[in-house]
């Protein structure tokens, strides 16, 4: 058994021992909102948004981007589970700003091993085999945080399956201060219809 697996199972045993009434939480989120944010381990939506278990849906992916799958989850969150407000929250110092689609595709074509970054950029540390399948994926990398938040809010707002009644707010989480910074233009673009 790996050390990580052992630690996770021990933590779960302690958590389950004190689970209490959480098994009675209803499936729809109590506070009726959803957050789309990055998978970065420094971001803890339960902390920065004041969430308890059962409060909100949290959808995470690399960059917190409005991918087809993220929008699928948001639509299910609304249509079947009743969320009424959505947040798109990207963050400062995001790894998605450190590469382009071409860089990622090249890295994968060379090797499937973990890459490394230094002052010269990303490079492979292992040897092949790689795969050219990375050329067929849109990696949704980020050039500018405010622009990417605006782009994602607009993509959600204009999606045919997203009701005009749902407000979509755009924010950037500052990893140095813990503060949420509104991207005013994004929140404006995500306004619900009156």
What are these regions (language model features)?
Residues 7, 33-37, 85:
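Short, hydrophobic/glycine-enriched beta-strand segments
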Residues 56, 71-74, 85-86, 101, ...:
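Generic internal hydrophobic packing segments that stabilize the cores of diverse globular domains
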Residues 81-94:
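Ordered, amphipathic secondary-structure segments that act as subunit-interaction surfaces
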């Amino acid at each position: 058994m790996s050390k990580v697996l052992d630690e996770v199972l021990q933590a779960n045993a302690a958590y389950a021992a004190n689970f209490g009434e959480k098994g009675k939480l209803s499936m729809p989120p109590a506070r009726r909102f959803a957050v789309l944010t990055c998978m970065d381990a420094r971001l803890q939506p339960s902390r920065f948004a004041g969430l308890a278990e059962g409060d909100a849906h949290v959808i995470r992916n690399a960059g917190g981007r409005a991918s087809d799958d993220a929008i699928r989850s948001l639509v299910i969150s609304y249509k079947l589970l009743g969320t009424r407000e959505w947040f798109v929250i990207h963050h400062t110092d995001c790894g998605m700003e450190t590469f382009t689609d071409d860089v990622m595709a090249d890295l994968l074509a060379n090797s499937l091993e973990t890459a490394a970054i230094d002052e010269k950029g990303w490079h492979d540390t292992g040897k092949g085999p790689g795969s050219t399948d990375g050329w067929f994926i849109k990696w949704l990398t980020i050039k500018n945080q405010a622009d990417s938040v605006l782009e994602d809010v607009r993509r959600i707002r204009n999606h045919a399956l997203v009701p005009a009644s749902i407000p979509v707010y755009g924010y950037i989480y500052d990893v140095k201060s813990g503060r949420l910074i509104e991207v005013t233009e994004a929140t404006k673009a995500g306004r619900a219809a009156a």
